[in-house]
């Protein structure tokens, strides 16, 4: 199969769809891999490394889309890419369609096959292609929250760890999944007093056993969240409903319960966000203030650490990319029900129920 890896063009997105080591696995199996010129530079991979892995370098993004049957990316296509996607082409990347009507319409119109990393789902309910970026995003959420607590950045002027004789910052994590656990562990490691809220009692029991002593668990209800807000310094929103929009757990009205300078980090912004007042931001302009509360809502948090992120992503996606290239998407999805759950749009039709429900296409 002809596999293409274009350069990501989203704001400050320095990740790339595959490492040279991943490319080498595909070319070793006889597949033709084309990489756009400088696609890997942001992640620390030169064109020469891809050539040594057996790839050929194409000069433009247009050439990659034109010549390749399967496109392996990190981010969803954005508007300049819409017209490059063609009928029958397989796109293997993150999409997050539920909060992107324009993207959904463009991919339906293109006639492409859209296989989304974020909805590939194992029988135990885990999301193997979302997990590596969730682990990165959770850790970064805690670090960014700590950074913006500085008074010079608009925060309360608190050191997350405190010092002897001075209490540490208090961190509330909404959602006890992969992102939430990673955020809680990082914040706890920095010395914060952490509370992690979830609606699953079995998950809360597991977190209670497995996380450090300065991580506490809380059943997630509106009342319990409200009671936490007056004394919290950082809130990390990490709720996930696979393939669907995220519910708003903190409303605009609830902002008044928090002290000015509190930092909200919305990791779920690519699925609509956990906070009613969230709107997408970028690495260039990551924060804004509403009602005295800082909002950090960067949709591609792992893009700030692209070398780590690209290695982690390729580790997870490669086996599926190989199956798709070896067998074609139809046979690969027939053989692997987990991969089949990644099918969101197929040649003009929405085939993932949660997305169809959002847009009334059921």
Residue ranges of model-derived segments:
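Adenosine-phosphate binding glycine-rich loop
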Residues: 118-144, 148-159, 269, 274-362
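Rossmann-like adenosine-cofactor binding region
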Residues: 209-291
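Glycine-rich phosphate/diphosphate-binding loop of Rossmann-like nucleotide-binding domains
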Residues: 6-42, 152-240, 287
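Short glycine-/small-residue-rich Rossmann-like dinucleotide-binding loops
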Residues: 69, 75-76, 95-96, 239-243, ...
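An N-terminal-biased, well-structured beta-alpha scaffold segment characteristic
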Residues: 2-106, 110
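Glycine/serine-rich phosphate-binding loop and adjoining beta1-alpha1 elements at the start
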Residues: 2, 8, 77-169, 298-300
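Generic hydrophobic/aromatic pocket-lining and core-packing "Φ" positions
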Residues: 23, 47, 104, 142, ...
């Amino acid at each position: 199969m002809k596999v293409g890896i274009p350069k990501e063009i989203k704001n400050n997105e320095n990740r790339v769809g595959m490492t040279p080591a991943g490319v080498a696995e595909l070319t070793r199996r006889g597949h033709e891999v084309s990489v756009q010129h400088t696609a890997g530079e942001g992640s620390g991979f030169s064109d020469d490394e891809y050539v040594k892995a057996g790839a050929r370098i194409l000069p433009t993004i247009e050439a990659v889309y034109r010549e390749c049957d399967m496109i392996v990316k990190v981010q969803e296509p954005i508007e300049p890419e819409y017209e490059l996607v063609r009928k029958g082409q397989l796109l293997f990347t993150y999409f997050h369609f539920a909060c992107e009507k324009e993207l959904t319409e463009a991919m339906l119109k293109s006639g492409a096959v859209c296989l989304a990393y974020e909805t590939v789902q194992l029988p135990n309910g885990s999301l193997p292609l979302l997990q590596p970026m969730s682990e990165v995003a959770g850790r970064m959420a805690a670090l960014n929250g700590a950074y913006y607590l500085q008074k010079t950045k608009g925060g309360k002027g608190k050191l997350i760890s405190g010092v002897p004789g001075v209490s540490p910052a208090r961190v509330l994590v909404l959602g006890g999944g992969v992102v939430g656990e990673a955020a809680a562990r990082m914040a706890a490691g920095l010395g914060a007093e952490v509370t992690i809220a979830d609606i699953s009692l079995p998950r809360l029991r597991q977190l209670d056993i497995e996380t450090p002593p300065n991580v506490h668990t809380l059943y997630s209800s509106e009342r319990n969240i409200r009671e936490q807000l007056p004394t919290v310094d950082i809130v990390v929103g990490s709720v996930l409903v696979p393939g669907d929009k995220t519910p708003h757990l903190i409303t605009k009205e609830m902002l008044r319960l928090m002290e000015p300078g509190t930092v909200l980090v919305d990791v779920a912004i690519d699925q609509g966000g956990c906070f009613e007042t969230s709107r997408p931001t970028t690495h260039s302009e990551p924060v804004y203030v509403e009602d005295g509360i800082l909002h950090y809502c960067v949709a591609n948090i792992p893009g700030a650490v692209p070398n780590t992120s690209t290695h982690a992503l390729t580790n997870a996606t490669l086996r599926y990319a190989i199956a798709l290239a070896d067998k074609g998407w139809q046979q690969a999805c027939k053989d692997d029900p987990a991969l089949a759950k990644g099918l969101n749009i197929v040649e003009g039709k929405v085939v993932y129920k949660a997305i169809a429900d959002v847009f009334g296409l059921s």
